[in-house]
């Protein structure tokens, strides 16, 4: 099965954007490429500056989409907790425990 990533990206206004992808660093480049933007409308208006947190799973797109939907409903305060402590994901998500927090490499 394909590896999926669910991520939180920090924008220049300190907001957090949530999404899913099969290639985390390619997706970051797409969100930050101003000349050929393939990112979401939200990130066109607000410059993405970093990957704040990310989780990976081999459980498929459906599971990744469920987590993405749950993260989008969290308050900013709870998202900030996850950015600082991504391993605390299951305090905020009651779905299957198929996600592993990953160490973000500097861009």
Where are these regions (language model features)?
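Structure-specific nucleic-acid interaction/processing domains
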Residues: 1-18, 22-107
């Amino acid at each position: 099965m394909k590896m999926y990533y669910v991520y939180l990206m920090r924008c220049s206004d300190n907001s957090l954007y949530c999404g899913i992808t099969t290639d985390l660093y390619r997706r970051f480049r797409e969100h930050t490429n101003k000349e050929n933007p393939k990112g979401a409308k939200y990130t066109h208006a607000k410059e993405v500056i970093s990957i704040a947190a990310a989780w990976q799973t081999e459980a498929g797109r459906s599971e990744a989409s469920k987590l993405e939907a749950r993260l989008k409903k969290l308050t900013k305060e709870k998202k900030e907790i996850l950015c600082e402590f991504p391993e605390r994901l299951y305090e905020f998500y009651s779905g299957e425990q198929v996600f592993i927090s990953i160490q973000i490499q500097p861009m």
